[in-house]
């Protein structure tokens, strides 16, 4: 283990620009072997690392809760770009190939731990193996895609995604829905002339479509508290921090919209008692029940890693959606009706208003 960890850190630290690692195995199998811990604290500030790896969809179909391993890793390693492939479409050859750096072939024990590995570092040999095993083959269809933007125009991904009437959102990067109209105006005033029309269009989408749709929200309590304290939202492609007064108005808008729209479900996932190892969530999930994407908290990306994972495979999207919906079965989950929220809000209003003023 220490050899693999040291090798990955050494090779990444000596590279500049873009680096690519091909992993010919199942992500969850390697998670259980502790492999993804080797990527902790990689020096990626001035460089980019893309990891291409397989996913055993049959295994995830049987137990969608295994996706927790994938989510926890993506949430922790925000500076790395992951692209997933159906394990059936790649050679499950226990190979690790870092472009222009090394080839490793390893063996796992019956208990799933690393037993041994062979190492090739000869430049010409590594290049030959990479050319023979790379993922450019058309039969290797990615299950996900990276994106730096969802598009703010009429023909962008965002427009198509929200042209639906039913949504599920697991929000970790502020609460970027049911926003007051004045917040859109503030964002528009701070935007470039090219963006202002797009912000106006986004406002119309939210107020006329999303606010009237059937929506299920799940929000971790740590993310909710962080939003109340700093007001940060990552709205499609725009970063913005609501003022304390705008946050107060936002709370009122959420409550009034829920009174008008009985099809909005609000659920909170308690993060109390999860231990010191819990560092919070910085990866949100958005679904319209047909397709979905995950969005990183841009504040915690330290390089040029893409902030969006688009889930392009319908089967994988169903698995991911089922995983996040399964969180409702946890004892830490609590769902609230509007009358309950109104009562709670009146009871803790002084605490909320003091929290809003924390700097």
Model-predicted regions and their roles:
Residues 1-334:
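Hydrophobic protein-protein interaction segments
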Residues 318-359:
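Charge-biased C-terminal accessory regions appended to nucleic-acid-, cytoskeletal NTPase
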């Amino acid at each position: 283990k220490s050899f693999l960890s040291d090798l990955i850190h050494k090779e990444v630290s000596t590279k500049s620009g873009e680096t690519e690692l091909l992993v010919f195995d199942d992500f969850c199998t390697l998670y259980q072997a502790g492999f993804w811990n080797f990527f902790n604290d990689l020096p990626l500030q001035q460089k980019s690392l893309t990891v291409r790896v397989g996913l055993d969809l049959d295994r995830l179909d049987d137990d969608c809760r295994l996706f927790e391993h994938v989510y926890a890793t993506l949430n922790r390693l925000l500076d790395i770009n992951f692209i997933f492939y159906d394990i059936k479409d790649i050679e499950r050859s226990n190979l690790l190939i870092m472009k222009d750096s090394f080839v490793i072939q390893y063996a796992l024990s019956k208990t799933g731990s690393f037993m041994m590995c062979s190492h090739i570092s000869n430049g010409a040999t590594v290049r030959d193996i990479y050319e023979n095993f790379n993922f450019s083959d058309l039969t290797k269809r990615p299950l996900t895609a990276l994106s730096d933007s969802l598009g703010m125009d009429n023909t962008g991904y965002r427009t198509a995604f929200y042209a639906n009437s039913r949504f599920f959102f697991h929000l970790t990067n502020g609460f970027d829905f049911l926003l007051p109209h004045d917040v859109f105006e503030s964002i528009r005033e701070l935007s470039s002339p090219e963006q202002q029309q797009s912000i106006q269009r986004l406002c119309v989408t939210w107020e006329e479509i999303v606010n009237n749709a059937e929506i299920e929200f799940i929000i971790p309590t740590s993310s909710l508290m962080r939003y109340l304290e700093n007001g940060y939202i990552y709205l499609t492609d725009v970063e913005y921090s609501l003022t304390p007064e705008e946050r107060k108005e936002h709370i009122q808008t959420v409550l009034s919209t829920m009174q008008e729209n009985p099809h909005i479900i609000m659920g909170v996932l308690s993060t109390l008692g999860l231990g010191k190892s819990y560092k919070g969530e910085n990866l949100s999930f958005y679904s319209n029940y047909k397709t979905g994407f995950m969005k990183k908290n841009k504040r915690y990306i330290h390089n040029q890693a893409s902030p969006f994972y688009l889930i392009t495979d319908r089967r994988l999207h169903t698995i991911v959606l089922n995983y996040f919906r399964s969180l409702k079965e946890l004892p830490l989950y609590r769902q609230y009706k509007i009358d309950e929220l109104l009562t709670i809000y009146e009871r803790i209003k002084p605490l909320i208003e003091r929290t809003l003023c924390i700097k």
